[in-house]
From Swiss-Prot:
GO terms under biological process: lipopolysaccharide biosynthetic process
Localisation per UniProt entry: Cell membrane
Enzyme Commission numbers on file: 2.3.1.-
Stated name of the protein: Putative O-acetyltransferase SAS0844
Family (UniProt): Belongs to the acyltransferase 3 family.
Signal sequence coordinates: none
Organism: Staphylococcus aureus (strain MSSA476)
UniProt superkingdom: Bacteria
Length: 604
């Protein structure tokens, strides 16, 4: 072994299959969450697991190089990262761009902008600027998941420079560790502060500044627990402690995958930090060369999946976005999920075998025009074929096919885009939906000319407002996009306190945008005194749907002046009622919900 100035040549760090096993758990959680978030409500925590692993592994590699050689070759590091990450992303972007042009051309402008952001690894800031909500998935945004890769790449660019600077200026490594810990606390504080001001999940979820805390915890672990310095034969007591802490942390993390959801507010008030600490304990145990938990995570099946975790992450969301765009959210047939999984596996395996691995080993030599090099030639031909439409998309050649909707609130329930689309109520003669008479005949009837109901609701009420007013001219309708039940009490006190008599009729359609408590519901109902109240329950593909409908049904049973309008039951199996989000209404849905309300009012 050649020695120069007290240092040896750099030796590769030992392979740690347990980390691949942990990657497998993380990516499976993410995929299940994106398939149907009600199956694994906290599956998105898998992203944080990846962040901690990245911080730990990258720092360990850099420290190992510095200890062996006395320097860190930044250029070589960045080239290795690009060879590892960029080719697979570029191929994904080319495929998604071409597929969007062929299958979803009206979205080509939005996807084009997302592609540009992804190329420069700024997707997270792009989505923040466009006020995109990560947790609402019914809008067609097949590249939205690349926000996390953007954060990691930004970290890979700046962190090595900072680390080298600190290593050269500060001799005591524990001091460097304290600096990174301090910055992680600042990042945590930023998340808590920004969230406390505006309650915006997406700003703190997407932000590099607010998510840096998780990556830096991995960095700190690399200083405390460098894998290249762990002993193969520690005392049995030490192994027992490591295994016990790692196992307990893993059990708690899996429980959190099932318990936490995107409405869990405490995760933004230190929760991500604490969950990442659990991940630290798991990593510490699976990278140790002699623990039994490391052997469990080194299971060949988990390692196989873990090695492909990057490809699986890249392709799963794009596949799900395309496939699910042809169905109503919340009413997706079971067989569709098998299609999702099958296509994800196929694309991920192709990417891993023919893109990731060759480019990681050979770099640009993985492409070759000479037919004698068959794999390289085929790869080159495919890339060039995809590159032509891809470049045309980027320069805007196909913009004429798209709608200029980039994403402002485009995938949030608090949106006017969907509602403006849904309110295109065209006169249709002789339409019949499950026994409904035509709109024209109903409007010509004077049955409802003399009733004066008050209707209060959210964006679904906005959807039916115009049609309902045409049938009940004296109705008073107050619908607002994004409204929640707890926000309605002050509104009622200020504007509708006169609706208290037994002859008054009040329709409340609330619960689309969030849950509420029994007390909040009762306080609202009590404001209407003896008035006849009609509660419209919800159909919304969110985890709170069942609880909202249960509370509304219970209120109807408890209070003699309250009637339940069971929109959930009425709309079951009627995908034609809904826009792609599974919540807002198409014209047939407008007529159906209006009919349910009118029938209830007529009975009383």
């Amino acid at each position: 072994m050649n020695k120069t100035k007290g240092f040896t040549k750099y030796k590769k760090m030992r392979y740690m299959p347990g980390l691949d096993g942990l990657r497998a758990i993380a990516v499976l959680g993410i995929i299940i969450y994106h398939l149907n978030k009600q199956w694994l409500t906290g599956g998105f925590l898998g992203v944080d697991t990846f962040f901690v692993i990245s911080g730990y592994l990258i720092t360990s590699l850099l420290l190992k190089e510095y200890d062996d050689t006395g320097i860190i070759k930044l250029k070589s590091f960045w080239i290795r990262r690009l060879k590892r990450l960029l080719p697979a992303v570029i191929v994904l972007l080319m495929v998604v761009g071409t597929a969007t042009l062929l299958l979803k051309s009206d979205n080509i402008i939005r996807v084009k902008h997302d592609i540009i952001a992804a190329i420069f690894y700024v997707s997270n800031w792009w989505y923040i600027a466009k006020d995109v909500n990560y947790f609402e998935q019914f809008s067609f945004m097949p590249l939205k998941h690349l926000w996390s890769l953007a954060i990691e790449e930004q970290f890979y660019i700046f962190f090595p420079v900072i680390l080298v600077t600190l290593l050269l200026t500060i001799k005591k490594r524990y001091k460097i560790g304290f600096i990174f810990w301090g910055v992680s606390i600042i990042s945590l504080g930023l998340m808590m502060f920004i969230y406390s001001i505006n309650g915006d999940h997406s700003r703190v979820y997407f932000g590099t500044d607010t998510r840096l805390q998780t990556l830096l915890l991995g960095v700190i672990l690399a200083f405390l627990w460098p894998p290249f310095k762990l002993k193969n034969d520690p005392p049995k007591v030490v192994k027992y402690v490591i295994d016990s802490i790692g196992s307990l942390s893993f059990i708690v993390l899996i429980l959190l995958f099932f318990i936490i959801n995107d409405e869990t507010n405490w995760i933004y008030d230190g929760g991500f930090y604490l969950i990442s600490i659990l991940t630290l304990f798991i990593i510490a145990s699976v990278v140790h060369p002699s623990t039994w938990i490391a052997k469990i995570f080194s299971n060949p099946v988990l390692v196989f999946i873990g090695k492909r975790s990057y490809s699986l992450y890249l392709w799963h969301f794009a596949v799900i976005s395309f496939v699910h765009s042809y169905y109503v959210d919340g009413q997706i047939p079971v067989y569709v999920y098998f299609i999702d999984i099958s296509l994800t596996i196929i694309f991920a395996e192709l990417s891993y075998r023919f893109i990731e691995t060759p480019f990681r080993k050979e770099g640009i030599k993985a492409l070759n025009w000479r037919p004698s090099y068959i794999p390289q030639f085929i790869r080159m031909a495919i890339v060039v074929t995809l590159l032509i439409p891809f470049m045309l998309i980027l320069v805007g050649a196909f913009n004429k096919y798209g709608k200029d909707i980039i994403g402002e609130k485009a995938n949030s329930f608090d949106t006017t885009i969907e509602d403006n689309y849904l309110m295109r109520i065209a006169p249709i003669d002789n339409i019949h939906i499950d026994g409904l008479v035509s709109e024209k005949k109903k409007e010509s009837s004077d049955v409802y000319n003399n009733i004066k109901p008050l209707l209060i609701g959210d964006s679904v009420m906005v959807d039916i407002g115009e049609s309902f007013k045409s049938s009940v001219p004296k109705s008073r309708i107050d619908g607002k996009v994004g409204r929640q039940l707890y926000q309605t009490l002050p509104l009622v006190k200020a504007n509708y306190s006169q609706y208290k008599k037994s002859s008054d009729q009040v329709v409340l359609e609330l619960g689309t945008n969030g849950d509420f408590t029994v007390k909040q519901l009762d306080d609202l109902l009590n404001q209407f005194g003896k008035a006849k109240i009609y509660l419209v329950n919800t159909r919304v593909p969110r985890i709170y749907e069942a609880n909202v409908n249960r509370l509304l049904a219970d209120a109807a049973k408890r209070k003699s002046n309250v009637t339940l309008i069971d929109w959930n039951k009425r709309s079951q199996g009627h995908s034609e009622y809904f826009a792609p989000d599974g919540v807002h209404l198409e014209y047939k849905g407008v007529l159906a919900l209006k009919d349910e309300i009118l029938k209830a009012l007529k009975k009383k």
